[in-house]
Amino acid sequence: MPEATAISSSVPPYPTKGQSIRLKNFDETESAFKHHSNRRLRQMWWLFRLMNSPTLNRWGSAALRLAMRWHLPVEPIVKATLFRQFCGGQTLEECQATIARLAQANIKTILDYAVEGESTEEGFEQVTQTVLQNIAQAKANPAIPFAVFKVTGLARFELLEKVSARKVLTSEEEAEWQQVQARVARITTAAEQAAVPVMIDAEESWIQAAIDELAMKAMRQHNRQRAIVFNTIQLYRRDRLAYLKACYAEAEAEGFYLGVKLVRGAYMEKERARAAKLGYPSPIHPTKADTDKDYNAAIEFCLAHLDRIAFCAGTHNEESSLKLANALETPAHPNVYFSQLYGMGDHISYTLAAHGFNVAKYVPYGAVRKVIPYLLRRAEENSALSGYVSREQRLIEAEIARRQKAKKCKKNLHVD
């Protein structure tokens, strides 16, 4: 394992009138990793190293998909590696220990039933019932501030693609689309009745128009008193900053609150590959700098309109997190949340939570075999973000070095 190196970050804050807390960086590792043994830290380091290799990642993902197709017993391997790192458990009951441990550090939990790509009415109904259970769980537990769902858990991908393309639906498809809208309405109505905000995840650009339609319809109905329904905006798309501003204008004109989760995006390679294959301009910004610029501009826009917007900054980017933290006049602003994925960005989550900011971890769960598509996507996304994964490795190295130094100092004191 390479020698650990010190990392620091210093960025100018967003403009603000006054500040009660000024964060300089996210270099502190002790609190972020204190619940991990030295052995576990080394296991995590090797996992991130494998994920940081595009070749190994590609081969591993292909092998895992092949094993699933052949119905090979891969669950034990997945459970001991990717699942252990990025999931809270297989059931709600198994997630309780994770929820409690995070709550001890003032970090909330967003339970994410991470089953993707359902294709049957029975499967869609099961996902709907699970999301409703998560809303009930959140109502009963203050450590769970949001519920969340993916529309592809409630509807066929092909149907969402056709609706998004504004194609004429057959009578059967029209009935199917009505069913999808009814499922979303059941979830969002339950969320409003329970006073539990619910986030709708963003997905591929060619089905996103249908998701946006469902989200905005639900906001008009349920966000009259406060933001209950949150749509997710992926700022790696060229058009999303303008879309955010258009949504705000609509909310302002129609008298409802806009709820948004701001993310950079999770389907970059897939989006670019499809655009190249079908011969249309990629909807994704050509550079990371362009994405960062739009992401930070989106945060700045939301901060300027907190009387009408509630938002969650879903980011592992230290610069964006520092800027937002240092821009807030009070850490625990009721309309602002930070969020990172479970198993990643702990140095950001724990530092923010220790200073009183609203922080929540996205905690995926579900049966191991059913969440493998999510885990593969997470591994592939991390491989595309090699700089970030390298940062996770270096933080683990820094914590191991810190422990070794502390152990040596303690030993020397004992000898003296």
Which ranges hold each PLM region?
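Positively charged, amphipathic and often flexible ligand-engagement surfaces
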Residues: 2-416
